[in-house]
Structure formats: C-alpha cells, structure tokens
Amino acid sequence: MTEAKPTERKKPTLPSLFKKVADSVPITWLTCYDYPTAYFQEQAGVDMILVGDSLAMTMLGYDSTLPATMDDMIRHTQAVRRGAPNTFVVGDMPYMSYQPSVETAIRNAGRFMAEAGCDAIKLEGGVEMCDRIRGIVDAGIPAMGHLGLTPQSASALGGFRVQGKGAEQAKRIIDSAKALEKAGAFTILLEMVPDRVCELITKRAENCIIMSLGSGPHAHGQLLIYHDLFGLYPKFKPRMAKVYGNAGEVILKGLKQYVQEVTTHTFPQRENYFTITDEEYDRLLKILK
C-alpha cells in the first residue's frame, strides 16, 4: 500500500502539544497497529497514536505484552506511519529492548526513529529507568515515561490491578513521575492510578504532559486501547474502557452471512466476478483443442 493522503491539518509537534496543555485543551491518544486504522484515526483528528506493545495481545493473540519483539514493533509502526503521516506517532519499547543497558535503549529507540519514522518513544518504569530516559533524550530522541500499571512487569505488581491505592505506593509513583520529568521525559502515561493521585502528579508537573489511561479526568489528555473502543478484543473488556460501538458484533454478523451465502450458492452474484466474452471464450476453446 502507498502512503495515505495526508489530512489538511498540521502535524502535531511537541510545541503544539504543550500549547494544548497551556490552553487547557485535552490531548487525544489512541493505540493503533495497522495502516487502515491509522488512516481513520488521522481522519478523525486524533492527536497522537501509540503503537503499543499491546499488539502482542490484540493483534498476535498472546496472553501478555512480553512476546512483542523490536521487529514486530518496527513493522507495525511503519504501517501506522504510512496510514497517518500527519499524526504524532509514538513507538512503544518492547520487553528487554531497553532494560539491559542505556546503550541498548538508545540503539532500539533509534531504530524506531530511523526505520519507522516515529516522533517519540515510550518506555515503562520509574526511578530505575531514569538513566535510560536521560540517555535517549541526550541522543536527541523525545521520550515518554509510563507509571502505575506497567504491563511488562505486571507479574511483579500482582497482576493487572490498580496501582497507588495505598499512600506509600502513591508517594512512590509521585516521586517517580518527578524523577522521570527531571530526566527529560516530555510525557508520562499514568495507567490505572487513582484519579486524585493522577491529579496531584498533573498539578506538580512543570514541563511534562501527563496522560491518563484509566487514571481519571485530571490529566492533560486521555489514552485508550483502540480495540477496547469497538469490542474487538474478545478475551476481556477492561473496566476503564468505554465501548463506542460494537464492531466485533458487526464483523461476526458479516462473517456468518458470508459463510451462509457461499454454502448456499447465493454468493457470488454477477456483480462480484468477471467474465470473458463469448467470442474470446470460443477462441480459447479452439486454442485448447
């Protein structure tokens, strides 16, 4: 496929995103993993797209995000960039693409920028990841942090559950947010953090955009998993998701109708296939003799 025709809007940039924050205009952010979905998200006016390692679950059928590889992420991000040339695209650093060392983190962040045309990268973790953030930013790559529920370490956190409900844990998240900001993160995603904890972090942010995924309305913007919006992930529906339309039901209905029409010889109809003229068909039969 070729690159989608760009929308007329100007592509969001770091300055324009910070201007939205200054003007109290919430930032819209969705996950995306493929060309056609990226095209529609750009046409809808979504500010940012996250090519999340959640693709391991939503697109590849794994039970966690851990199996996603850098090659998986690059290939899907390339498709998204072609579909949304005028949208701010963020590449999600997959498991073990940044944890081993600062050098590994910089190298893989660079792949997102050079091979996939990303505008920024995101990685999970708190204070322990500040040196990775700092190294990536020093290399000239915009970097986002991710706190609260961090799916790559969900097992250590006790599963997919709210983080920061206790005062001590909430304090650690607040401290980590400030540390990531000081390390150079321009955005921090708070996933499944209590709303008032998110509000405290947002109010304390000086030069950092705070985004919410299930963390309430007080952040500078919202992120949702695209498949959750339309009932496209059959294994479970997160409480934090809002279903804006059940595309899964529509797709299933269409698939069942297709199977029924083929098995009963009602598809294809004349408008669904191509024919050869009688003259050319007669010539073909003569050639075959």
What are these regions (language model features)?
Residues 2-289:
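Alpha/beta enzyme core
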